[in-house]
């Protein structure tokens, strides 16, 4: 086992990364090894997808499968060995299919089929024992003694960034948004990473390419969500419990929420969002469901307590899931799509009757709590609608600075930095937030500036796209570039979606960002120095010191 993809990975003087019997996330060594083998098989599929494209062969089904299966290897997504093995076996079938199509096309064209690298040649074992025996060939640091640590760090930066992009591709696909050119570029990068490179410049360029690719993917996802559900609008949301039977929907998948809402109409069941599903309450399409009553709980790391206390059924539509046995709710939590946990019921297809039946036999909330409301829904259209008022307030001096504070949440104590930062921002500044990092401060009162709320909840982590659009619009109005705006970006990271959002911002030329609370363990000190020199990217320090720098206070 070797896994170093998330913020909570083991860090020791002897080396970084989870490499024992179990990762810090609870992932067993066998699960980690099977995930590595799955990635290896997917890279082999991409090798042939690239070759097939050269002969004019595009398979949309395979284009969708590879990022979806890749998504299953993200932090806190799939811990079910059987499901991971099934993905690997399907990858082997697709690779064989593409190989045959490619070779047939070459024969028809009168050309010789090209040799493929080792990553596209592995004959996958048929049992778990055989697959685990093959896993060393796919170990991410298998050649660590032969390559410089900076090269290893760049490889992992690319791999983990592409994982994040794959997740957004799958979210977009569910909403009907696919793009053959995007899929083709994705396969090219997967294929490249399947042949471990020692070219630092090429790897760095690839990391930026992944960022550019993800910008296109975020635009696709934005289009998918807004076309399906309308543009989010400022919305007041209750965060307390409501009497009645209950279902809690966590993850990121708006389509699953819609299916659950449709199937619970008239059933006497209240539906709550959780975590990154909170932004759903701002979409017009969901407001026709009076039984979508609010948001329950906070970010992913608190779920073992929050789900244990929730008196209904829980659905995990995507990341992040952690051990449901700790809170003794494994019999009433359901996984969906790429999510998996051994022994937990997995919902296939679009029928959520098992979830509904479970909710109906559970007690539900026995009384209404006194409501506590927050305001959400400041995504792209709402931000653009507010832009003229924002510009006038900037010109008048009422608004002097913008902060984007968001990203992933986590359970480390030093993440209190983000709470204190938000609380310490000047009263003449606006705070944009997104991702589950918002839960560090989104229930606090920040007031407004001439009717403009000081705290603007942009949405999910992928809604960084909306914040980028606002920054571009403001830069155009003030005839400057983004880096000349009075704008400070402070990103909390935990896993691979945050990594690819960071790469996206860097690829767009955004500079002087801060990330925290700790730097990725796979980034060497030398790589961190290069990123600081090239982009001004640095780690958070103290709220007082960082604010002075961001506000240019001597």
From Swiss-Prot:
<feature type="binding site">
    <location>
        <position position="461"/>
    </location>
    <ligand>
        <name>hybrid [4Fe-2O-2S] cluster</name>
    </ligand>
</feature>
<feature type="binding site">
    <location>
        <position position="276"/>
    </location>
    <ligand>
        <name>hybrid [4Fe-2O-2S] cluster</name>
    </ligand>
</feature>
<dbReference type="InterPro" id="IPR016100">
    <property type="entry name" value="Prismane_a-bundle"/>
</dbReference>
<feature type="binding site">
    <location>
        <position position="3"/>
    </location>
    <ligand>
        <name>[2Fe-2S] cluster</name>
    </ligand>
</feature>
<feature type="binding site">
    <location>
        <position position="320"/>
    </location>
    <ligand>
        <name>hybrid [4Fe-2O-2S] cluster</name>
    </ligand>
</feature>
<dbReference type="InterPro" id="IPR016099">
    <property type="entry name" value="Prismane-like_a/b-sand"/>
</dbReference>
<feature type="binding site">
    <location>
        <position position="495"/>
    </location>
    <ligand>
        <name>hybrid [4Fe-2O-2S] cluster</name>
    </ligand>
</feature>
<feature type="binding site">
    <location>
        <position position="6"/>
    </location>
    <ligand>
        <name>[2Fe-2S] cluster</name>
    </ligand>
</feature>
<keyword id="KW-0479">Metal-binding</keyword>
<dbReference type="InterPro" id="IPR010048">
    <property type="entry name" value="Hydroxylam_reduct"/>
</dbReference>
<comment type="function">
    <text>Catalyzes the reduction of hydroxylamine to form NH(3) and H(2)O.</text>
</comment>
<dbReference type="GO" id="GO:0042542">
    <property type="term" value="P:response to hydrogen peroxide"/>
</dbReference>
<keyword id="KW-0408">Iron</keyword>
<dbReference type="GO" id="GO:0051537">
    <property type="term" value="F:2 iron, 2 sulfur cluster binding"/>
</dbReference>
<dbReference type="GO" id="GO:0004601">
    <property type="term" value="F:peroxidase activity"/>
</dbReference>
<dbReference type="InterPro" id="IPR011254">
    <property type="entry name" value="Prismane-like_sf"/>
</dbReference>
<dbReference type="Pfam" id="PF03063">
    <property type="entry name" value="Prismane"/>
</dbReference>
<feature type="binding site" description="via persulfide group">
    <location>
        <position position="408"/>
    </location>
    <ligand>
        <name>hybrid [4Fe-2O-2S] cluster</name>
    </ligand>
</feature>
<dbReference type="GO" id="GO:0050418">
    <property type="term" value="F:hydroxylamine reductase activity"/>
</dbReference>
<keyword id="KW-0411">Iron-sulfur</keyword>
<feature type="binding site">
    <location>
        <position position="497"/>
    </location>
    <ligand>
        <name>hybrid [4Fe-2O-2S] cluster</name>
    </ligand>
</feature>
<feature type="binding site">
    <location>
        <position position="18"/>
    </location>
    <ligand>
        <name>[2Fe-2S] cluster</name>
    </ligand>
</feature>
<feature type="binding site">
    <location>
        <position position="25"/>
    </location>
    <ligand>
        <name>[2Fe-2S] cluster</name>
    </ligand>
</feature>
<keyword id="KW-0560">Oxidoreductase</keyword>
<feature type="binding site">
    <location>
        <position position="436"/>
    </location>
    <ligand>
        <name>hybrid [4Fe-2O-2S] cluster</name>
    </ligand>
</feature>
<feature type="modified residue" description="Cysteine persulfide">
    <location>
        <position position="408"/>
    </location>
</feature>
<feature type="binding site">
    <location>
        <position position="252"/>
    </location>
    <ligand>
        <name>hybrid [4Fe-2O-2S] cluster</name>
    </ligand>
</feature>
<dbReference type="InterPro" id="IPR004137">
    <property type="entry name" value="HCP/CODH"/>
</dbReference>
<comment type="similarity">
    <text>Belongs to the HCP family.</text>
</comment>
<dbReference type="GO" id="GO:0046872">
    <property type="term" value="F:metal ion binding"/>
</dbReference>
<keyword id="KW-0963">Cytoplasm</keyword>
<protein>
    <recommendedName>
        <fullName>Hydroxylamine reductase</fullName>
        <ecNumber>1.7.99.1</ecNumber>
    </recommendedName>
</protein>
<dbReference type="GO" id="GO:0005737">
    <property type="term" value="C:cytoplasm"/>
</dbReference>
<keyword id="KW-0001">2Fe-2S</keyword>
